[in-house]
Amino acid sequence: IVCNNNFHGRTTTVISFSTDPGSKDYFGPHTPGFIHIPHGDTIALEDKLKKDKNVVAFLVEPIQGEAGVNVPDPDYLKKVRHLCSQYNVLMIADEIQTGLGRTGSLLASCGNCDCNSSCEQQSSYVRPDILILAKALSGGTYPISAVLCDSDIMEVIQPGQHGSTFGGNPFAASIAK
């Protein structure tokens, strides 16, 4: 499940679930099977989770940036976390545009950081199952990204099963350090 007006990049599968005609219409073929809901709408999320038992994950930007600055209600991510846990669906927070201090907090999703279970942005601590970071990770000086999650998720992919053109780049890692 993804949100309308999302922006998660420009790779083939990601473009497949874009709702921006300028990004999608002349680029394909598209990967099928994505479900769209309005950003900030937990009622729509729960409705889709109830109807489709094959949903694996919900990918969300804590604050949408490409669609304007679309800030959801303060308890939105807390409700998302609860629904994802209730329906055994991974919560994936895409913090590429919002993470690492770009919103005034370490993370806009307020998870996987030392905020003592509270945050100035939200009324409660929210920890996504998967956290995606980039851009600010190197201070904008060199391309680097990171996918953070617990080992029970990460170890589903075994060495050699998946590759990355720029993965494992020691120079980029030293810049991010």
Residues covered by each model-derived region:
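Conserved N-terminal phosphate-binding loop of PLP-dependent enzymes in the Aspartate aminotransferase
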Residues: 1-177
